[in-house]
Amino acid sequence: MALRTIDSLGDLRGRRVIVRCDLNVPLKGGVIGDDGRIRASLGTLTGLREAGARVIVISHLGRPDGTPDEKYSLRPVAARLGELLRADVAFADDTVGDSARAAVEALGDGDVVVLENLRFHAEETSKDETVRRGFAESIAELGDAFVSDGFGVVHRKQASVFELAQALPSAAGSLIASELEVLDRLTENPERPYTVVLGGSKVSDKLGVIGHLLPRVDSLLIGGGMLFTFLKAQGHEVGASLLEEDQVETVKGYLAEAEERGVKIVLPTDVVVADGFSADAAHEVTRADAIEGTPAGAKGLGLDIGPETADAFATIIRGSTTVFWNGPMGVFELEPFAAGTKTVADALTRVEGLSVVGGGDSAAAVRALGFDDDRFGHISTGGGASLEFLEGKRLPGLEVLGWQ
């Protein structure tokens, strides 16, 4: 069965449409650090407004542990959404209480209200299906139809993602549809050469993706903290760098499988090693197989890929027709260790084909380093969701919308 789209809901004029967005943006002191996820929601919200729907936006933000916490309030998000829509956006101080009901009652055709953080209610993320269903039904009382457009949460069986879609006539928004279209191109007959770039801190987070994509890719480039588990699997010492000792044997298996399949797993030839985890730590570039030969010795921390590796990765990326990247190459938040990530990001902007930035830390990195979104083929809004899709896992938030 195909994914249900908004068209399946019929005429929406005057109807109350609850839209589950993923507006989980970085927020500090009420200031939004990156509004990319808010911008990503605009297509669906604008379409619903133009159709005359009365739009009720719901989302989570952060992890407030099931109780109200002002620092996780969606109020600043509602204000920014209003600026981007160039329209008045109302805000309700609760999710299913008197404020929410009054705000929804006051909506006219084409109006928008944002309800308070879903995760101020422990029921949203409860492991008990009955509890989640009860909360979903409370939300459903506010609307006539439901649109799921938070791609970043479709891998989670939560009340506003799974049960709410069963409580009302439901469909996927345009953001989810576009995400699936792009991810399909990465798994179903991708144009070649096809390169996957993986970074980030833990190799254990990426094992499923590696296993699922090995039969499909031409090259797999490994950076970030996870590279040190690969180096260890090759017999190299890695100092005090991040290492998942319990994954070494699994990595050895993938290295052997890649060789059998003729897939190139490209590991760094040089790394930036520091004597501490700070921007002012003494650091130097060294060969990847000689980390403990630096002045820091066994206490040396590998915090970025080296310039030789970055250039080699960039050459492979630029020569590819399809590229998927998930995970920074180093600790990009600290300027001395951002060069590898910046070089890889720049190479993706030069791909003459499909370049996909896989959400999460990768999306944050390219924006923090000054790259505009439109320089890439696609920046996913779903870090974990994108990875689980590429692992071939079943995603409950999609299946409930008819996706198979």
Curated annotation (Swiss-Prot):
Catalytic activity: (2R)-3-phosphoglycerate + ATP = (2R)-3-phospho-glyceroyl phosphate + ADP
GO molecular function: ADP binding; ATP binding; phosphoglycerate kinase activity
Record-listed ATP binding positions: K206, G302, E333, G359, G360, D361, S362
Binding site for substrate: D22, L23, N24, R37, H60, L61, G62, R63, R119, R156
Domain of life: Bacteria
GO biological process annotation, one example: glycolytic process
Location (main, coarse): cytoplasm
One family name in Pfam for this protein: PGK
Subcellular location per the Swiss-Prot or TrEMBL entry: Cytoplasm
Record's keyword terms, sorted: ATP-binding, Cytoplasm, Glycolysis, Kinase, Nucleotide-binding, Transferase
EC number: 2.7.2.3
Enzyme class, broadest EC rank: transferase
Pathway field: Carbohydrate degradation; glycolysis; pyruvate from D-glyceraldehyde 3-phosphate: step 2/5
GO cellular component labels: cytosol
HAMAP family: Phosphoglyc_kinase
Oligomeric form and interacting partners: Monomer.
PANTHER family: PHOSPHOGLYCERATE KINASE (PTHR11406), PHOSPHOGLYCERATE KINASE 1, CHLOROPLASTIC-RELATED (PTHR11406:SF23)
Family per record: Belongs to the phosphoglycerate kinase family.
Name of the protein in its database record: Phosphoglycerate kinase
Organism: Clavibacter sepedonicus (Clavibacter michiganensis subsp. sepedonicus)
